[in-house]
């Protein structure tokens, strides 16, 4: 029994939800999202809540039940509040700057790295912090992971790009024989 799937998803004021066949359509202002359940779960909209139930009693149906409920919750949170991830840049000479829709990173390579910002994502740079914001949780996480991938933090000095919540396990360097 899915503990997540059986919880109803509340529809906040200002968010419109429509069910057209297997397609859930969400709208708030000029932002619109869609979720196709592909007929894997039963969906009902009652009294300002979205209710999910499994199609069958098999393991796969129960797995989809919780998954689609979580995806729906993330879409609603994304439309109302949005998601953000903060990255920190540590290292001498490591910098980030915004130039239009391109994030320019100087991460100790012989050349700057230019990262084209995807549609629907807003990036702000504040000294050594890069803040990635957007309404789609998956895209925000993917963009943050791609930026981190350019120079992941190394364990000896901690130089590189890391999430603000990430803790780097440090290693001791070589000890010299005397």
Curated annotation (Swiss-Prot):
What role does it play? This protein binds to the 23S rRNA, and is important in its secondary structure. It is located near the subunit interface in the base of the L7/L12 stalk, and near the tRNA binding site of the peptidyltransferase center.
Q: Does the keyword RNA-binding apply?
A: yes
Instruction: State what protein this is by name.
Output: Large ribosomal subunit protein uL6
Q: How does it assemble?
A: Part of the 50S ribosomal subunit.
Gene Ontology cellular component?
cytosolic large ribosomal subunit
Top-rank taxon of the source lineage equals Bacteria
Q: Name one GO molecular function term.
A: structural constituent of ribosome
Instruction: Write out the entry's keywords from A to Z.
Output: Ribonucleoprotein, Ribosomal protein, RNA-binding, rRNA-binding
The entry's family comment says: Belongs to the universal ribosomal protein uL6 family.
Query: Which InterPro entries would you find in this protein's record?
Result: Ribosomal_uL6-like, Ribosomal_uL6-like_a/b-dom_sf, Ribosomal_uL6_a/b-dom, Ribosomal_uL6_bac-type, Ribosomal_uL6_CS
Which NCBIfam families has this protein been placed in? L6_bact (TIGR03654)
In terms of Pfam families, this protein maps to:
Ribosomal_L6 (PF00347)
Example of a GO biological process term: cytoplasmic translation
């Amino acid at each position: 029994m899915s503990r997540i799937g059986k919880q109803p998803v509340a529809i906040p004021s200002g968010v419109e939800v429509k069910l057209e066949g297997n397609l859930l359509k969400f709208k708030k202002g000029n932002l619109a999202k869609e979720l196709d359940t592909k007929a894997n779960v039963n969906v009902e909209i009652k009294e300002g809540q979205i209710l999910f139930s499994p199609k069958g009693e098999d393991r796969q149906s129960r797995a989809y039940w919780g998954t689609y409920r979580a995806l729906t919750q993330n879409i609603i949170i994304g439309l109302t509040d949005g998601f953000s991830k903060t990255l920190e840049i540590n290292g001498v000479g490591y910098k980030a700057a915004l130039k239009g829709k391109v994030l320019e990173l100087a991460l100790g390579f012989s050349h700057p790295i230019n990262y084209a910002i995807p549609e629907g994502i807003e990036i702000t740079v504040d000294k050594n912090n890069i803040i990635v914001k957007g309404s789609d949780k998956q895209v925000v996480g993917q963009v943050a992971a791609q930026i981190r991938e350019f120079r992941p933090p190394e364990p000896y000095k901690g130089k590189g790009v890391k999430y603000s919540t990430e803790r780097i396990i440090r290693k001791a360097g070589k000890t010299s024989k005397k």
